[in-house]
Swiss-Prot record:
Highest taxon of source: Bacteria
Protein's name according to its UniProt entry: UPF0180 protein BCG9842_B3897
Classification via Pfam families: UPF0180
InterPro entries in the record: UPF0180 (IPR005370)
NCBIfam families: PRK03094.1
Membership in a protein family: Belongs to the UPF0180 family.
Species annotation: Bacillus cereus (strain G9842)
């Protein structure tokens, strides 16, 4: 399973991904995104942590406007 970075305010997404067997890392700073296959951010404060510019190998998913299920589907597609 993938290592997924999730902003700390997205607790429902964190729980859903853990139930699917993914390793979930809480994103508190740009360094937390290192080594993640994919990162999920709220999108409310665009690029507040600099993750959009970070050199992570995975993609960044913006959760704004998506349900928890839709976010989980995006993770499955992108990882």
């Amino acid at each position: 399973m993938a290592r997924i970075g999730v902003e700390n305010s997205l607790t429902d997404v964190q729980q859903a991904l853990q139930q699917q067997g993914h390793e979930v890392v809480t994103l508190n700073s740009e360094q937390d995104a290192q080594g993640c296959d994919c990162c999920i951010v709220t999108g409310q404060d665009s690029n507040v942590m600099g993750i959009a510019d970070a050199s992570i190998k995975g993609s960044v998913i913006t959760a704004h406007g998506l349900t928890t299920d839709e976010i989980c589907q995006q993770v499955e597609i992108r990882t």
